[in-house]
Curated annotation (Swiss-Prot):
Belongs to the class-II aminoacyl-tRNA synthetase family. Its main location: cytoplasm. Catalyzes the attachment of threonine to tRNA(Thr) in a two-step reaction: L-threonine is first activated by ATP to form Thr-AMP and then transferred to the acceptor end of tRNA(Thr). Also edits incorrectly charged L-seryl-tRNA(Thr). This is Threonine--tRNA ligase. One of its GO terms (cellular component) is cytoplasm. It is found in: Cytoplasm. Disulfide bonds: none annotated.
Length: 637
């Protein structure tokens, strides 16, 4: 087939050229400086290697190395180079998958070698060696039979399984670098020499494709960056995040613990439960002032309720099922069907709507043991759950009211940066287009009226309705999706919830699923790390520690402790015979915001020496002044 003349658009310039030229050569001829920074390219919206040959009119956008897309490609390259390094060091190793993840990558390996962090130096040295070899990274498309035959001969059973999962109409592509060959869609950099700044981070176990019934593999995580500064900044971030790990802080502050006999469930200690209750009561009071009615529903239900709601067929694998002589039951994984049952206990008129039912409901989900992580991923959890039953016309006003409530809560809890995402109708959905149109218009209108700036997640709505997601940005600039509001036309109809409209006809209400925190456990984990355990005074489990310099002032110190407690301040005492510098260090480590230090001088002058967390300075104040300072701060959020 002869060459044809193509029209190409590159960086707002259009020109003609012959087909068959590589994308890289086109960019190089156009601007050599830009080409030197380009790792791959987008051709008509599809990311390709620079070796890709043009065969049709094209809009070309260079993917620069330091761009978000460029760094993602670099990390994918590093995953391949790491896999090559591991196989060169340990030839018996077989390969699983090696995708890019947030800020890094991983690769799963099947090997008799038990990897540990101590192996990283050797693997990293081999990676640097492969980078120095500067292998060209070459893409080839193989027939399905050839690909299967090749990987079968190498004993790469996981690659063979991956090929079997590729749709028949999709091409099978592989990438070569030296003698190393891997199954991959790409794109990749032109050569391994593009990699310079990387670090292996940790190793863990993982099931093949996340299936607990499949093989157990070893997963090595790493990160790669376009610049040395980028890598160093990220490693510094990881160091700070490790210091803030809620599991370590939880142990230091005696907040909670976890143990094997109750996997994924939390043992709250006194300090942790105080923190939990303070947060719960704060949310409870907010809900009360915003017109919510608190309910409490059972923990265990017969499967017939879940069959009617649709959860039994779609969610059973994630439910804890109990079998008895009376049939099959389940611990509830969510509260929504139970709230509909509460709603149905009396006849409702349109005048009774909106009805807002809230519950701090204990739920259980059978999460894979490998997915459990401290408070962030548990099996037993409490949701700050509420469901608003309303008419279609009330969706907008209820959404505005909820957004206002959510902003108040996040502000009070110290989160000033919140991202909002709007997810509209997915391809597979229930309900007709007219109903979806009304719901999406109502939600968008509400967000506009509430002054929310949001991004669109096309097609990411729930199958039963569109949704809004609220993403918190913490002190380390990490993002946590916590709040949500979801419109549901389906469940009220499935469970036959109705109201009488103004024409006397039965209608099904719209159900708004909404949460602010998500789950208490996860949100408390986020809070601990956000504040590094150094909570604002109103949240702190212990607000004041009264420390004595000498046992001779113990009676005076006890009277101060009693005074604090009567005022409603959470205070503890330390009258031990330890040195005062030890006491100060101990209670500072436990993140107590305020220390009252008591000696003979303070006793004689009816005063206290006040030391605030984070300060090496102390200040002598009268008891009334010191107490007044606490009360003023305590009442400010």
């Amino acid at each position: 087939m002869g060459r044809v003349v193509l029209t190409v658009t590159l960086l707002s310039s259009s020109f003609s050229l012959s087909s068959g030229k590589t994308v890289g050569s086109v960019i190089s001829d156009f601007d050599a400086e830009i080409f030197s920074k380009t790792i791959a390219a987008s051709v008509n919206g599809v990311s390709v290697d620079l070796s890709y040959r043009l065969d049709c009119d094209a809009n070309i956008e260079p993917i620069l190395l330091e761009s978000e897309a460029g760094i993602e490609i670099l990390r994918h390259d590093c995953a391949h180079v790491m896999a090559q390094a591991v196989q060169e060091l340990y030839p018996e190793t077989k390969l699983g998958i090696g995708p890019v993840i947030d800020d890094g990558f991983y690769y799963d390996f099947s090997t008799p070698i038990a990897f540990s962090d101590s192996d990283f130096e050797k693997i990293e040295e081999k990676i640097r060696e492969i980078i120095q070899r500067n292998y060209r990274i070459i893409r080839e498309e193989w027939s399905r039979d050839d690909a299967v035959s090749f990987f079968q001969k190498k004993g790469e059973k996981y690659k063979v399984e991956l090929i079997s999962r590729i749709p028949p109409e999709e091409k099978i592509s592989i990438y070569k670098q030296g003698d190393f060959i891997d199954l991959c869609r790409g794109p990749h950099a032109p050569s391994t020499g593009w990699l310079k700044h990387f670090k292996l981070l940790k190793v863990s176990t993982a099931y093949w494709l996340g299936d607990a019934k499949s093989d157990s593999l070893q997963r090595i995580y790493g990160t790669a960056w376009a610049t040395k500064d980028g890598l160093e900044a990220y490693l510094s971030f990881l160091h700070e995040a490790k210091k803030r790990d809620h599991r370590a802080i939880g142990k230091t502050m005696e907040l909670f613990h976890l143990q094997e006999e109750a996997q994924g469930q939390v043992f709250w200690h006194e300090n942790g439960f105080i923190l939990y209750r303070v947060l719960e009561n704060y949310i409870r009071n907010k809900l009360k002032t915003h017109g919510y009615r608190e309910v409490k529903t059972p923990l265990v239900y017969n499967k017939c309720l879940w069959e009617r709601s649709g959860h039994w067929s779609k969610f059973k694998e994630n439910m804890f099922v109990i079998r008895s002589d009376d049939g099959e039951f389940s611990l509830k994984p969510m509260n929504c069907p139970a709230h509909i049952e509460v709603y149905k206990q009396s006849l409702k008129s349109y005048r009774d709507l909106p009805l807002r039912l809230a519950e701090f409901g204990m739920c259980h989900r059978n999460e894979a043991s490998g997915a459990l992580h401290g408070l962030m991923r548990v099996r037993g959890f409490v949701q700050d759950d509420a469901h608003i039953f309303c008419t279609p016309q009330q969706i907008c006003d209820e959404t505005i009211a909820f957004c206002g409530l959510l902003k108040e809560v996040y502000r009070d809890l110290g989160f000033t940066e919140v991202e909002v995402r709007f997810s509209d109708r997915p391809e597979v959905r229930l309900g007709n287009d007219e109903t979806w149109d009304k719901a999406e218009i109502a939600l968008k209108s509400a967000m506009d009226k509430a002054g929310l700036i949001y991004t669109l997640n096309p097609g990411e709505g729930a199958f039963y309705g569109p949704k809004i997601e609220f993403v918190l940005v913490d002190a380390l600039k990490r993002k946590w999706q916590c709040g949500t509001l979801q419109v549901d036309f389906v469940l009220p109809e499935r469970l036959d919830a109705t109201y009488i409209d103004h024409e006397g006809k039965k209608q099904h209400p719209v159900m708004l699923h909404r949460a602010i925190l998500g789950t208490f456990e996860r949100f408390l984990g986020i809070l601990i790390e956000h504040y590094d355990g150094k909570f604002p005074l109103w949240l702190a489990p212990t607000q004041v520690a009264v420390l004595t310099i000498t046992e001779k002032v113990e009676e005076y110190a006890k009277s101060l402790l009693n005074h604090l407690s009567k005022t409603g301040i959470r205070a503890v005492s330390d009258f031990s015979n330890q040195r005062i510098d030890y006491k100060i260090r101990y209670h500072t480590t436990r993140r107590v915001p305020i220390l009252w230090i008591i000696g003979r001088i303070e006793e004689k002058s009816n005063s206290v020496t006040v030391r605030r967390m984070g300060s090496s300075e102390s200040e002598v104040k009268t008891v009334d002044t010191a107490l007044g300072d606490i009360l003023r701060e305590f009442n400010v959020r």
